[in-house]
Amino acid sequence: MAADGGCERNVVHRMNEEYRAWEALKSVLRNRGLGIKAKKCLYEGVIVPTALYRAEAWGMRSAERRKVNILEMKCLRSLVGVSLLDRVTNEKVRRRAVIERELASRADQRVLRWFGDDMERIDEYRMVRRVLMAEVSRGRVRGRPWLGWMDSVKVALGNKGMTVEAARQ
């Protein structure tokens, strides 16, 4: 988490690492002789964990979610053997690759899992809990107010139709 409460630098760093992992495996994953099932296993076993390392602490904004999903679709299109010029929709590419959820929603799932499993067990006086539950206090700035980690938890729970109080029970 950055000093300003954001996670953009972390997300960009993880996406660079994902791209480096992709470049290392590109010749294998573009091989037409290898089946989709084997390619998916490599993708799920190497690239997804590389991209989502430490995603539990991310409070992603929509711009960062878009970056994550764009890079994921670039990898999936290459994995399936479809270019942008083929004009195949993202949903069809996901169906061909047998991948149900976006990478950004997987990051949200990790945030919620950490919130539900680990966060509730941490003593309220420990520094980790105090930092993550803290409100980002800044003077009035132009634009949208800063979002903290707890705000991203609320957004992720809202996408599932839940509230923080309901999730704690």
Regions found by a protein language model. Give the residues of each.
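Short linear motifs embedded in intrinsically disordered, charge-biased segments
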Residues: M1-Q169
